[in-house]
């Protein structure tokens, strides 16, 4: 292995769909448990503390499969793709 070259890692084309599916599952789980889903997800994304996400429905394990920056990137892309650029 050549240590002089930077290796490029690509999350793949399925990653955004997986992030979306994960966020939908986590959101629904948080609602089911009586939490404010937006506040809890934002708390997790800002702090990295998985305690913001319940273990119920395997939501905590699902969201931790994605890097927080990957989730934020998907949220921003989705927001801008919806025409929210004004």
From Swiss-Prot:
Pfam families: IreB (PF06135)
Positions of disulphide bridges: none
Top-rank taxon: Bacteria
Signal peptide boundaries: none
Transmembrane domains' residue ranges: none
InterPro entries tied to this protein: IreB
Coiled coil feature spans: none
Family, as annotated: Belongs to the UPF0297 family.
Name the record gives this protein: UPF0297 protein LCA_0388
UniProt organism field: Latilactobacillus sakei subsp. sakei (strain 23K) (Lactobacillus sakei subsp. sakei)
Taxonomic placement: Bacteria, Bacillati, Bacillota, Bacilli, Lactobacillales
